[in-house]
Regions:
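Short histidine-centered loop motifs in beta-beta connectors
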Residues: 15-26, 30, 53, 59-66
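Conserved beta-strand segments that form the floor/walls of ligand-binding pockets within enzyme
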Residues: 6-8, 61, 75
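Short beta-strand-turn/beta-hairpin segments enriched in glycine/proline and small hydrophobics
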Residues: 1-21, 39-52
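Generic structural signal for short, solvent-exposed loop/turn connectors between secondary structure elements
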Residues: 1-3, 64, 77-78
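Short hydrophobic beta/alpha edge segments that flank linear recognition/processing sites
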Residues: 26-48, 69-78
């Protein structure tokens, strides 16, 4: 059964900590509870999006630089 990682805020979702950097995590990677999987930017403020469970990141539901709203599913883990 998949578990959802939900956006806490509206804004732009980023999979990388900055231009030219590697993504925080890729699909198929193991993820730990509390691990950062991306950032949401709103008005030049960045908030980390963290996994709530240990597992494997199955799929990102939002593209890098995609618009998210509170409650949107960002990724699925198993």
């Amino acid at each position: 059964m998949s578990r959802q990682i939900i956006s806490p805020l509206p804004g732009i979702f980023y999979r990388k900590p900055g231009p030219g950097k590697d993504p925080y995590i890729n699909e198929g990677d193991t993820v730990s509870a509390g691990q950062t999987i991306g950032l949401v930017e709103i008005m030049k403020q960045f908030s980390e999006v963290r996994a709530e469970f240990d597992g494997v990141l199955e799929k990102f539901e939002v593209d890098d630089f995609g618009v998210v709203n509170p409650g949107d599913v960002i990724a699925l883990t198993s």
